[in-house]
Design a protein with these regions (language model features):
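Conserved donor-binding/catalytic core segment of Leloir-type glycosyltransferases
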Residues: 15-32, 38-41, 54
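Aromatic "clamp/platform" in nucleotide-sugar-dependent glycosyltransferases that forms part
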Residues: 83, 102
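Conserved acidic donor-binding segment of nucleotide-sugar-dependent glycosyltransferases
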Residues: 125, 135-137, 141-148, 156-162
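Carbohydrate-associated surface elements
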Residues: 5
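A short, well-ordered alpha-helix in the C-terminal region of glycosyltransferases
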Residues: 150, 157, 164-178, 187-190
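A conserved nucleotide-sugar
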Residues: 34, 38-79, 160-164
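Short hydrophobic beta-strand element within catalytic cores of glycosyltransferases
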Residues: 119-124
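Short glycine/serine-rich donor-binding loops of glycosyltransferases
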Residues: 87, 107-110, 130
Length: 192
């Protein structure tokens, strides 16, 4: 399988101190399973109250998801950012990126996050996109769909173990070269 090349507009990896923020990006629809992310964040937040969750995206579940954040007691720690032209800059400096999709091909948000070196947690979802590029525990973390505890534990593991998180981020950056326009172009040319 030949993947699509990474957009040249994706910012370079960030090497500074990461913000105490978990980020996720995607339409506010059932497929993206933001409910799982909010529930996992609530569990994580009970042990890490100085962290916030930023959700980027718009959709029909906006009101329901805000209600869930309130129900879980984290409304003040969850921000719904909607559409943002600088979403990549926000993700790039975050502590962790999470994608909890129920089904997904190769998510651009996931690939961008990995290529920027952000420690990334994704679900093993139908479509297998995350499993095509993430080696669990090596360049990211995979969890089962709706396994809220596993996702919360993965968040905690990454923020509590900065050396591990840094190592995962460094290995994830290797995708940047693998997805460069030049590398992908060479793969296509070799087929012709």
């Amino acid at each position: 399988m030949i993947l699509n090349p990474l957009s040249e507009s994706v910012p370079e990896p960030y090497d500074g101190e990461r913000r105490k923020v978990i980020t996720t990006s995607g339409r506010l629809e059932e497929q993206k399973n933001h409910e799982m992310t909010i529930r996992a964040f609530a569990r994580f937040h009970s042990l890490h109250p100085d962290y916030r969750l930023e959700i980027f995206g718009e959709g029909s579940l906006d009101v329901r998801l805000r209600g869930l954040a309130a129900e879980e007691g984290v409304a003040d720690a969850v921000s719904f950012e909607g559409f943002s032209p600088n979403v990549l800059d926000c993700i790039r400096t975050s502590a962790v990126f999470v994608m909890s999709s129920r089904f997904e091909g190769l998510s651009n948000s996931m690939l961008e996050s990995l290529c920027m070196g952000v420690p990334t947690i994704c679900t093993r979802c139908m479509g297998g996109g995350a499993e095509a590029v993430i080696v669990d525990g090596a360049n990211g973390i995979l969890v089962d769909i709706d396994d809220v505890e596993a996702e919360a534990n993965a968040m905690a593991h990454l923020v509590d173990n900065s050396e591990y998180a840094k190592a995962i981020g460094l290995r994830a950056r290797e995708l940047r070269q693998q997805l460069s326009l030049e590398t992908i172009g060479d793969k296509w040319l070799s087929l012709l």
